[in-house]
Amino acid sequence: GKELCYTARRVPNPEASTDSSLWVVPVGGGEAKNLTPGMPGYDQDPVYSPDGRWIAFASMARPGFEADRLRLFLHDRQSGKNQELLPDFDAGAHELRWTKDSQALFFTAEVEGTTQVYTASLAGRQAVRVTNGRHALSGLQVAPDGASLFALRTSMERPAEVVRIDAKTGAITALTDHNGPAFADLALPQIDGEWFPATDGKQIHAWIVKPPNFDPSKRYPFVLYC
């Protein structure tokens, strides 16, 4: 590589700002160049495509709003232009990973209280869900052949274990079970997903965690966590 891309907050009073930008600098030294001027939010996580044409990155639209949606952007290193790949995708894109042909990306996104793997091609510009299940997937990596993905899978009952994901079907295979013996004799809670109407009519997803050996005829203390 001939250059390095990084995130920096080069603004007055950076401690009070979320306006970080992508910068590139030659590896041999030289002047740094801002790749995202005019983008006032939080730009982060740059990843070069294998062919060197693109830099994928995540960007928040609004300054000063740390919970804004992380949009998936592409920086064209030939034209210098930035473009949003998935403007209609209603979730934040995390852990951006290129396919080896530089024609698509894998990433993780939160949906209905879970974290799933998605993919999006540069040509199709649509997010396609790869995995399903009541879990959170993180630490995403793509195998050299592109046929498999690797990640850590956690759930509300289990800590992280390593899994392999079929990139086409989304089938998940557990590769480790370090905590299996410890959980073998445990009584685990019953967990159900529910939807509730908000005051504005929108639906809010929530998890209801019932104690082990739950008896619906009995009354239990209730704790609300938001």
What function would you assign to each model-found segment?
Residues 1-3, 46-54, 96-104, 140-148, ...:
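Blade-terminus and WD-like Trp-Asp/Gly-His loop motifs, strongest in beta-propeller folds
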Residues 7-23, 34-47, 54-73, 84-94, ...:
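A flexible loop/linker signature enriched in serine peptidases of the S9 family
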Residues 26-30, 76-80, 121-125, 166-170:
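Short loop/turn segments that connect beta-strands within beta-propeller blades
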Residues 29, 79, 111, 156, ...:
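Short flexible coil/turn linkers enriched for glycine and charged/polar residues
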Residues 33, 83, 128, 173, ...:
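Structural signal for short hydrophobic segments within the conserved structured cores
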Residues 76, 81-85, 172-174, 217:
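Acidic/polar loop patches that form or flank catalytic/metal-binding clefts of enzymes
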Residues 85-95, 128-140, 176-187:
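Conserved blade-ending motifs and adjacent loop-strand segments that build the rim/top face
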Residues 102, 139-226:
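Serine-hydrolase catalytic core recognition
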